[in-house]
Amino acid sequence: MAATSSSPPCNISASSLLLRQPSRSILKVFGLLPPVSRNNRKLGRLTVTRSNLAQDFLGDFGARDPYPEEIASQFGDKVLGCQSTEHKILIPNASVLSLSQLQCSPVSSSQPPLSGDDARTLLHKVLGWSIVDNEAGGLKIRCMWKVRDFGCGVELINRIHKVAEASGHYPSLHLESPTQVRAELFTSSIGGLSMNDFIMAAKIDDIKTSDLSPRKRAWA
């Protein structure tokens, strides 16, 4: 009769199993499986069952309100930073507002025009405009639009004029060709650029022009 070999006994503790990410069957053996809550929903003739096992097993993560004992311990005085989460609503000042949200103001003839450096800084806040020399030896800003036809060019000029009339600061508008419109801005009373010119340029940038642009051709 052949001798039978016996394997050594295997001692497995519950703690060693839990450290190895136990499966549902192992948790069930040791009575550690949390109750499964199911939510049934009716979708037509079908019943959809959703299990909340993962949520119940992991618990509820996230912030919570402090307990009365924690408030009494004045724990907020022992941490860095501000323990208050009150939000303060501040009124935005002119430095953070868009130029198109500002209003043109009267310009005195004794006021000096903007320097080239200041003009180039403000130029970053408008789209499609460039700085050129004006006839008086100062600076002005210019923008060009390509439109679909002559009627679209006239419509764009009318839209710009309407915005300029509401602001009280008028650009020089030119229909250079049936498909091209040019606008130029500078303050004639000071012979150069003022803040009003860039405010007006930003307001012109907000005008809708997509319906006046040339149609793009699709090549097969």
Swiss-Prot record:
It is found in: Plastid, Chloroplast; Cell membrane; Nucleus. Keywords: Cell membrane, Chloroplast, Lyase, Membrane, Nucleus, Plastid, Tetrahydrobiopterin biosynthesis, Transit peptide, Ubl conjugation. CDD domains: PCD_DCoH_subfamily_a (cd00913). GO terms for molecular function: 4-alpha-hydroxytetrahydrobiopterin dehydratase activity. Residues 1-50 form a transit peptide. Ubiquitinated by SDIR1. Ubiquitination leads to its subsequent degradation, thus controlling abscisic acid (ABA) signaling. Ubiquitinated by AIRP2. Ubiquitination leads to its subsequent degradation, thus controlling abscisic acid (ABA) signaling during drought stress. Its EC number is 4.2.1.96. It is a peripheral membrane protein. It catalyses: (4aS,6R)-4a-hydroxy-L-erythro-5,6,7,8-tetrahydrobiopterin = (6R)-L-erythro-6,7-dihydrobiopterin + H2O. The keyword Transit peptide applies. Its main location: plastid. InterPro entries: PCD_sf, Pterin_deHydtase. It holds the Pfam family Pterin_4a. Involved in tetrahydrobiopterin biosynthesis. Interacts with and acts downstream of the E3 ubiquitin-protein ligase SDIR1 in abscisic acid (ABA) and salt stress signaling. Regulates the expression of the bZIP transcription factor ABI5, which mediates responses to ABA during seed germination and salt stress. The SDIR1-ATP1/SDIRIP1 complex plays an important role in ABA signaling through the ubiquitination pathway. Acts downstream of AIRP2 in regulation of ABA signaling during drought stress. Interacts with SDIR1. Interacts with AIRP2. This is Probable pterin-4-alpha-carbinolamine dehydratase, chloroplastic. It comes from Arabidopsis thaliana (Mouse-ear cress).
